[in-house]
Swiss-Prot record:
Residues 1-72 form the Core-binding (CB) domain. Its main location: cytoplasm. This is Tyrosine recombinase XerD-like. It comes from the Bacteria. It comes from Streptococcus equi subsp. equi (strain 4047). It holds the Pfam family Phage_integrase. Residues 92-248 form the Tyr recombinase domain. GO terms for biological process: DNA transposition. HAMAP family: Recomb_XerD_like. GO terms for cellular component: cytoplasm. GO terms for molecular function: DNA binding; tyrosine-based site-specific recombinase activity.
Length: 248
């Protein structure tokens, strides 16, 4: 089925960002169902989307349904299948923050800069402004640490094994900043644009730098970190702004 992805994309008039998103979703779908497309494998695929947001689910189901129709038209499938993409969102007066399935953030992508920005927020809780100021000299990949200096002092953060490969690739160039623009940092808007394009490509357009930072907080809390420890990791003067996450 994977062989049909590129002809399918060529048959549609898609912007580059949308094309990358379609390709990612369809490769993921084909890897999961293999060559056996039937009601059972499609049901299992739908179940695998249960940890995603409503918007991400609808996007993936819509993409796959279009692909299934294309396969039927091309006689690659003898039967026409269509998954139910009607998803009812659950609403409450007080939205509850939950930890997300972030496996898609680590998958292969054409949006490498946006991906690394997202991972630095998700894994280290950094803000776009802090990321803009990161220099290659701040990283010690051998010791797996980042030393971030600010007016409040130096924060030493551990780099996870999952994050290291992305940093190793990004720090190969001879430059001053991690994201370098003629030995100067890029603008704040540039970082938001890169992040937005990456999030859209993985079907998470509703997320933002702030919501990824909240995921960092929730993950650290789940790992057993105290509110004081998380405040220190984020470089906060006080843990007051974190109280709502620890009352959940």
């Amino acid at each position: 089925m994977i062989a049909f992805i590129e002809p399918f994309l060529a048959s549609k008039s898609l912007a580059n960002n949308s094309q990358q998103s379609y390709r990612y979703d369809l490769r993921q779908f084909c890897q999961q169902v293999g060559q056996r497309i039937n009601p059972e494998t499609l049901a299992l695929y739908q179940q695998s989307l249960s940890g995603l947001t409503v918007a991400a689910k609808k996007r993936k189901l819509s993409t796959v349904n279009q692909f299934l129709y294309y396969l039927y038209q091309q006689k690659a499938l003898t039967d026409y299948f269509k998954m139910d993409d009607r998803i009812e969102a659950s609403f409450s007066l007080k939205p509850q923050l939950t930890r997300l399935d972030t496996s898609a953030f680590y998958a292969e992508t054409a949006f490498l800069k946006g991906q690394l920005i997202a991972l630095l927020i998700l894994e280290l809780g950094l803000t776009p402004s802090e990321i803009a100021g990161l220099r290659l000299a701040d990283f010690d990949l051998g010791l797996q640490v980042l030393r971030l200096q600010s007016h409040r002092g130096i924060r030493v953060m551990t780099l996870s094994k999952a994050l290291l490969p992305f940093l190793e690739k990004a720090t190969e160039a001879q430059q001053l900043y991690l994201f370098d623009h003629d030995a100067k940092p890029f603008s704040r808007q540039w970082f938001f644009n890169q992040l937005r394009d990456f999030l859209e490509s993985i079907g998470c357009a509703e997320l933002s730098a702030q919501s990824l930072r909240e995921q960092f907080i929730l993950n650290e809390k789940a790992a057993g970190k105290s509110i004081i420890e998380v405040a220190q990791l984020l470089g906060l003067k006080s843990p007051i702004t974190l109280e709502k996450y620890y009352k959940m």
